[in-house]
């Protein structure tokens, strides 16, 4: 069964709602160097993470700033959303954290690490180290844009890569079933797709997203 991650959570009550709906992971965007209504401090992320059950993964999303790591006592995983190199991924893995590395897919199906177009050799190097890769839509916002990318390209990557692939980018309750059927990812990730306003989740949308994903 495909797993679900609800990301960009800013309130403990939204994390509790996601947990009750049957999500497998919750994510907080922690002290990233971009302007987003979903950004929280490490201390606030700990508060959010503390309300979910022990079997729910608690993912801290970081972006070229690892300083918060020592203050994220409640996190069980990190999602590296910047240009972090394989050595950094390995260092975090040695701390006992699950490591997810984000890559971006553009509308032509090309894969990017930040502003660098990358090929299979670079992807393979990361895949030897990380626990999963996340495919998001390439955009100026660095994620959370609500835009989907080429799912056919993502499906090819799922078949090619030797690690679990998490699909993100423009997913919502209305299209996630189609995305799962086409891409066959290990998990799906949504943030803006289940919000009633930026940074504030919609309980009904979360529940429907989980139901639609797990019905496939």
From Swiss-Prot:
Catalytic activity, per the record?
N-(5-phospho-beta-D-ribosyl)anthranilate = 1-(2-carboxyphenylamino)-1-deoxy-D-ribulose 5-phosphate
Q: Which PANTHER family match?
A: N-(5'-PHOSPHORIBOSYL)ANTHRANILATE ISOMERASE
Q: Share an example GO biological-process annotation for this protein.
A: L-tryptophan biosynthetic process
Check the record and name the Gene3D superfamilies matching this protein: Aldolase class I (3.20.20.70)
Which GO-annotated molecular functions does the record name?
phosphoribosylanthranilate isomerase activity
Sorted alphabetically, which SUPFAM superfamilies does this protein's record hold?
Ribulose-phoshate binding barrel (SSF51366)
- The gene name on file is trpF
Pathway it acts in? Amino-acid biosynthesis; L-tryptophan biosynthesis; L-tryptophan from chorismate: step 3/5
Keyword Cell membrane in the entry? The reply is: no
What is the name listed in the Swiss-Prot or TrEMBL entry for this protein? Answer: N-(5'-phosphoribosyl)anthranilate isomerase
TM spans (from-to):
none
> What Enzyme Commission number(s) does the record list for this chain?
5.3.1.24
Q: Any idea which UniProt keywords this protein has?
A: Amino-acid biosynthesis, Aromatic amino acid biosynthesis, Isomerase, Tryptophan biosynthesis
Entry similarity comment: Belongs to the TrpF family.
Q: What is the lineage of its organism?
A: Archaea, Methanobacteriati, Methanobacteriota, Methanomada group, Methanopyri
The answer on whether this UniProt entry bears the keyword Hydrolase reads no
Show the Pfam families listed in the entry: PRAI (PF00697)
């Amino acid at each position: 069964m495909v797993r679900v991650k609800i990301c960009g959570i800013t309130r403990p009550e939204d994390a509790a709602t996601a947990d009750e709906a049957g999500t497998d992971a919750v994510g907080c965007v922690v002290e990233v160097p971009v302007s987003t209504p979903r950004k929280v401090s490490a201390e606030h992320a700990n508060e959010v993470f503390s309300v979910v059950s022990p079997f729910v993964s608690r993912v801290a999303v970081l972006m070229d700033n690892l300083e918060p790591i020592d203050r994220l006592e409640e996190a069980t995983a990190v999602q590296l959303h910047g240009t972090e190199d394989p050595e950094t991924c390995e260092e975090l893995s040695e701390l006992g954290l699950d490591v997810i590395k984000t890559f971006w897919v553009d509308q032509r199906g090309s894969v990017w690490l930040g502003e660098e177009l990358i090929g299979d050799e670079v992807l393979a190097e990361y895949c030897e180290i990380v626990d999963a890769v996340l495919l998001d839509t390439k955009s100026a916002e660095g994620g959370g844009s609500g835009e989907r990318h080429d799912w056919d390209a993502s499906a090819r990557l799922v078949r090619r890569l030797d690690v679990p692939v998490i699909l993100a980018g423009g997913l919502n309750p209305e299209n996630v079933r189609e995305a799962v059927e086409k891409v066959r990812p290990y998990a799906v990730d949504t943030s803006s797709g289940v919000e009633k306003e930026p940074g504030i989740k919609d309980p009904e949308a979360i529940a429907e997203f989980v139901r639609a994903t797990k019905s496939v």
